[in-house]
UniProtKB/Swiss-Prot annotation:
Modification comment: Caspase-dependent cleavage is required for suppression of Drice-mediated cell death.
Placement of BIR repeats on the sequence: 12-77, 116-180, 215-280
Protein name: Death-associated inhibitor of apoptosis 2
Mutant phenotype after disruption: Normal development and viability. Acute sensitivity to infection by Gram-negative bacteria with failure to induce expression of antibacterial peptide genes and inability to mount a proper innate immune response. Loss of cleavage and nuclear translocation of Rel. Increased activity of the effector caspase Drice and increased apoptosis following x-ray irradiation. Reduced ion channel expression in Malpighian tubules.
Zinc finger (RING-type): 451-486
Quaternary organization: Interacts with the caspase Strica. Interacts (via BIR2 domain) with rpr and grim. Interacts (via the BIR2 and BIR3 domains) with hid. Interacts (via BIR3 domain) with Drice. Interacts with Dredd; likely to bind Dredd simultaneously with Fadd to form a trimeric complex.
Amino acid sequence: MTELGMELESVRLATFGEWPLNAPVSAEDLVANGFFATGNWLEAECHFCHVRIDRWEYGDQVAERHRRSSPICSMVLAPNHCGNVPRSQESDNEGNSVVDSPESCSCPDLLLEANRLVTFKDWPNPNITPQALAKAGFYYLNRLDHVKCVWCNGVIAKWEKNDNAFEEHKRFFPQCPRVQMGPLIEFATGKNLDELGIQPTTLPLRPKYACVDARLRTFTDWPISNIQPASALAQAGLYYQKIGDQVRCFHCNIGLRSWQKEDEPWFEHAKWSPKCQFVLLAKGPAYVSEVLATTAANASSQPATAPAPTLQADVLMDEAPAKEALALGIDGGVVRNAIQRKLLSSGCAFSTLDELLHDIFDDAGAGAALEVREPPEPSAPFIEPCQATTSKAASVPIPVADSIPAKPQAAEAVANISKITDEIQKMSVATPNGNLSLEEENRQLKDARLCKVCLDEEVGVVFLPCGHLATCNQCAPSVANCPMCRADIKGFVRTFLS
């Protein structure tokens, strides 16, 4: 959903007409962080990175959830330069054009190097080239030789001969997101990332089913094994919900049912949930595009599967099980979250108070005794970078959000992908070491290519920014930290060993 005008906060706010007043997060907070309502219950989508979030809980900070779900979104990295138009900047007269405030940049595309370079038209300092400064994330302020970073708002002046723009940027502002991306990579929007083959990370909605074996165990009483084998469904990211032939994706939470013998699980999954990150990682964007093209060509045919129906938690909060739980002193947010989980997992409501309480206790890891749980602690908000002006003669580093840890550079990780695969291939054809038996050599070569999580499939995903090739396509979505170095995973690149 990328309708024209969604860069305007007022347009995005209009999509929240049916947003519940007692929702865990307010429509205003969502709009201010780039989201619009999709119309699918509590689901909201970011206009700038297209990440979707629907499992909101009381105490959530929208900016923090957005940063965790899509750390390279332009709205997260540079909200003042991503093209977002706050309501305060819109004209009071309907139909008039939007006027930028003095603090905002007249060109909302300064995240692009070419547009930054244009600002150096009258650059006065011959000690360093405009190309080097633009590459390092700076644009010219038209004042002496002062340049400003689009990402961290840091300002540097008094450039000297032989200065390296990126190294100076790194020295004064080491936590700047542009610095952490590395000198060789230019900022890319979601579309550019797709073209580069980089897939941002999103957390699975049902992480306990991220493992294929865990999904397979749910099919113990699968009723139509003669029509659809459980193994094929589990490989496609689906687990059984113990209701008819209804299955659900562990990652995107799409529900599918009414299976026919000719149905292919991967095809149906991609057809009904083309933005599912698990499908995109396991099968690739080309496969999803092919499925959508085939579906469009056969639009007149009857769909083989249909999304599972859902109910609204608002209505169920007035039912007996919810009212009885509230009467026991259990927090309303806890009850609502339990009901929402039940709807997402099964499409039906709790029939008794006991069933509701069991779900609450299971989720909290509590025992059988009734406990009144405290509301969840609010997440720490993401601290906006502060602006600082730095002269190279006497510099003061800029404070940047503590929540952005220093990581290996993404550019180096991307550049190392081919190097990693080449090394593995060389290992496969290397002359056996005289100190090792042929059997031991073969074992080591095989281990080097095995997924470090399931120890079964061949590795096929490179983690960014660390650059490790450690898991297969199936296991990659289930890990938040690299199994090799424990670094946070910000993105994936599908890799093929030939």
